[in-house]
């Protein structure tokens, strides 16, 4: 193991790497004071604010004012915003403005949080960055220019593109595979220019600095003391700061007796690090988790130490200075060195030691992961619905200020949960509950907003009661009493494409009639519910233009009324099969039951109750395919070996089947056929522990996206303790054990199986944020997910998805912070499967992933006996984009800053006696090209659209201004630093040139993301 395993990779990289050089002295150390402030993790946000976070900003500001040479970088915005709005005095606010102006306080990264890179979706990464950047720019007129991504557990290749588009000049990471980092240190390859996307030009690359193995914390061991070094304020105490100001583990104060020893320790560490880099400039991070809550004692000890070293530069061979990232990267950039290039590979998965693979968190707390994505999808729909309500003219009584507040609350919650100890599932239970509460409260507000828009009037108005709103993968439940009663259902399509799909409502009666807004009957199906044996699932076929509505009336059918025969939803037929044992002898493949549509024939084996094969009707190829649930067993005792926990995946052995018997039933109707498989852990069990509900839409339905997908929803749990559950799909595809999985729903990574000498199973697990696939020379099997999972290919033709984990161990760290993941929940994840020729799958894969993430939203209102159905808004002009272009956001952000940077700075200098009202006139539009260059002969072409035509339903477009990713830069003013590389990058297309404001015809190239402010005629 160790660095030798990476020699082939390093050999390839060195071809693009300049010859290593030893740093020319004297060494210049940049001491960067910082505090790593997790937005959650072990303690809630409010607990952290009370115990230490507020004191960080209060004391740092005071100490920076005291000493002109002092510096500090601030990273995540959530704690700072809470301090700014709820703690800071006017004097402190003015001091912050002055320190920012002087460059002694620097905001880096600037997002609401430091987001995880493995399991977060691109849309949500952009959201949380936009939230933080919007606040900083609106409040101070500043725009962060460097990243500080030091704690996410691995690094995604999406990040270089993301941060380049945000305007960053350099990027800093830390957690990459331990043996790769060791090898890169020895080869002086920790700094390079990273090309994030194979399709994009060098304008969307970024200079990247990988921290050495000391990472972002100051070395804690000093040879002359049994206390930690350089942590003079000690360790934060919860729930309250100690009244005497004495904290645990406070470093020995710097005195005349020990200052030389301190200096020797610091100098030795700087020199050790300098050998790992190509220049004499050394970044020396001073800080760690929850530091600088007493900045006075920190600086009062470091000041004399730095002075002591600088007075003896000739003796020590180094100089030291307080620095921000701008100071460090400016010095590095001024060397004009030629840097190596890293292509679009990521740094995933991440292992910190040989037996510590951080791949368990890809699945930990699956329920929270699912809720976070549901909240994101709801916010996405709510943003465009509110924008369509506001333009061209608000027609209802809705208060726009209240509406924007609901959206802002959910923006905050969705941004917060992207933190690297949030959606990852690596937080304590009470912090998980905090994230959940914030998400649910935000979703409730946006639900009220959407019901008000779609069903008319202010929140709660009208004679009928709004029932609820449901996003994708959530089924609304309608109940009735003995009176004739019905429901008005509005279905909103948040995508800028026309869609044909099936929505599901759960009702309490089998006789239902459904009509559209014109009173015409629609295609429906009713069947026994999968959730409640006393209820029924009502399926409705719907076709909806982009950013538009369909309205339906759902009534309890009474048969003949006044001579009119109601059209009742046809009832599906159910066929049940007897229970089958897993090890029961059978003549496999002799009694197959087909389920088919225009695209597929699914064959199920009556003798096993298992999927047998799938025929792709386009290519006429039949692929043998089985699916089953298995479990990995995890060790709980640290004395017995490696353990699994929230972070780590360390199975004892290969996965074993977790069931003894399986039942099956088929429910066939006019719209779909459902196949329901129930897996029992033991033959004597009355309750099943696992299930697969497979749905195939029928051939008469239009729409290739609907026909080409096999929808599956699973039930998993509750698990036995120390079990990690997977769904393994095995096929006869000759995949060569090569898996492809996505980075953040943006780009795919090739994942060949690696034969590690130790820990091979978990080190071959990868994050699947939205999709994964395996293929051979003829066919591709695609899996699409509505929440993150761990995914792996442990055998040829296999792909396994980890669905759930339940763990407890006796590791002292986990027990101290309650991080053992004893998750007793039942989870219901969804996957869509697609199988077909690679060309067909290439075309359908990106659009289908977006369709799963952003399904139609159903809004319901109960009707009284005589009440007329509410048909809600009708938008005559849909918003329609080409199939290779995705409407990533359409919103009214509410920012008050001027689009002119100079004017905005003048406004800030004048000051505002009161906070200005939100700007409801500015519309934010972001478009994303879904395809890689050369991926598809048609869909990989640049997409050209006229925004005046696309947005005509919102009004007359009078100006189009292109902005940076988070909206704070006019792209015509954005000039990022150029870092010289050995080879000119010839790959990628030329980025389309910015057009002057008002130019409405735009071209988006493969994988481009372009952001605009749109101005409509008043």
UniProtKB/Swiss-Prot annotation:
Binds 1 zinc ion per subunit. GO terms for molecular function: carbohydrate binding; mannan endo-1,6-alpha-mannosidase activity; metal ion binding. InterPro entries: Gal_mutarotase_sf_dom, Glyco_hydro/deAcase_b/a-brl, Glyco_hydro_38_C, Glyco_hydro_38_cen, Glyco_hydro_38_cen_sf, Glyco_hydro_38_N, Glyco_hydro_38_N_sf, Glyco_hydro_57/38_cen_sf. Residues 1-21 form the signal peptide. The active site is at residue 151. Its cofactor is Zn(2+). Keywords: Glycoprotein, Glycosidase, Hydrolase, Metal-binding, Secreted, Signal, Zinc. It is found in: Secreted. Glycans are attached at residues 226, 249, 294, 336, 511, 528, 620, 652, 818, 822. GO terms for biological process: mannose metabolic process; oligosaccharide catabolic process. Its main location: secreted. Pfam families: Alpha-mann_mid (PF09261), Glyco_hydro_38C (PF07748), Glyco_hydro_38N (PF01074). Mainly expressed in the narrow region between the caput and corpus epididymis. It catalyses: Hydrolysis of terminal, non-reducing alpha-D-mannose residues in alpha-D-mannosides. Plays an important role in the early step of spermatogenesis. Belongs to the glycosyl hydrolase 38 family. This is Epididymis-specific alpha-mannosidase.
